[in-house]
Amino acid sequence: MAGLTLDAGALIAYERADPRIREILGTAFRRGLVPTVPAVALAEVWRGDARDARVARLLKACSVEPLSEELARAAGRLRRETPGAGTVDACIAWGVRRRGDAIATSDIDDMRRLLGPGVTVLRV
């Protein structure tokens, strides 16, 4: 994998110490990858209290991708091309496409629909 993006489902899985996300991240870190966490995914899981501690530690080893105007417009076009796609998923998917990343997600079907063939979608 060229890179790894974590969506909200992956962050929640990490928060819950799910072994699948731990394995995915272990592989990424051994390969020297710095996972990307889209800011919109972080916004979906962050609560601003003690429950965020595990995710906060993970973020120290990740790159948080801001939602730029360019990304927002591209995600809007992707939503238009993918009926039923959600805004957050489209923002995440566009970044994955642009970077050529694999994605760790619990939202397999929607991400596959948005990303199309050729993108590695890892279930958490």
Q: Residue ranges of each PLM-predicted region?
A:
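Short, polar loop motifs at secondary-structure junctions
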Residues: 48-51, 106-110
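Short loop/helix-cap segments at secondary-structure boundaries that form the rim of catalytic
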Residues: 56, 111-117
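Acidic, metal-associated active-site segment
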Residues: 45, 86-102
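Alpha-helix capping/helix-boundary segments
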Residues: 10-11, 41-42, 71, 92, ...
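Short active-site oxyanion
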Residues: 31-34, 61-63, 97-102
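Short, well-structured N-terminal submotif of metal-dependent ribonuclease cores
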Residues: 1-37, 46-60, 124
